Amino acid sequence: QGKIILAVFLLLVAAAALFLARLSSAGQALGQPGLRLAAMELHNEDSQLVRTNGVALPAQIFDCTSKPTPVTKLELDWLPRDTTYGRRRYSFPDKTWIESSVVLMGQDRTSIHKPEYCLPGQGFTIDLREVVTIPIERPHAYDLSVMKLTTSKRARDRNGREVPLRGVYIYWFVADGKLATHHLDRMWMMTKGLLSEGVLQRWAYVTYFAICKPGDEDTTFDKMTKFIAESVPKFQTATGPRKN
């Protein structure tokens, strides 16, 4: 019985995706983002200007220094032209870093894809997937449900020696007044929005990524949760239900 229910759900989601594609191409009204946008210059790997606005990721968090990171040519070629980006790397005094990235759709919903597609292309193997919650205190207390991926790869150090690396990758989806942890949930909410309101919800996916040595995954995740709790209220306007 469980398999039948799952099959019906997946069939409904597939039908919803087809329905979305047809409605999107018909030029539906585009909803507001659940993130703050700002005028800024974003560049590709060759330092060429590619955008003059983006997601307003904060420049200062804790005692980190930060700098914008490039939007890759692969992304610019693959994703729709009306995609909006946010990209920043935050460096800690201990030489570790956390990279934050946002991809925000425009009228073309295909900007939003499963982040799991990106990691294997960068040489990472996904070892563990789990849904976790991160407490956020502003503008009110709520729990942010996110997907946590623990990853691994082998890389070469400065001396050319092959060494094992671990990565912690955290992501979720956000639109105006809406949050989602799973890709299918986001698609379903988008479909309901089109049917009930006639508005194409403007979804984004937000990611945070850090690498570490094997055995340091829990410490790295703890650092990331504190960082996310501090940074999210500075650029994300959508929130979860208020905690009692």
Regions found by a protein language model. Name each.
Residues 25-50:
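Alpha-helical transmembrane signal-anchor/signal-peptide segments
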Residues 49, 56-57, 82, 198, ...:
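Generic detector of ordered secondary-structure context
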Residues 3, 28, 35, 122-124:
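Intrinsically disordered, low-complexity regions
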Residues 62, 96, 202-204:
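A generic secondary-structure signal marking the coil-to-beta-strand transition
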Residues 52-70:
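Amphipathic alpha-helical segments
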Residues 2-3, 11-21, 133-244:
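A short, solvent-exposed beta-edge/loop patch
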Residues 47-48, 65-196:
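Short, solvent-exposed recognition patches
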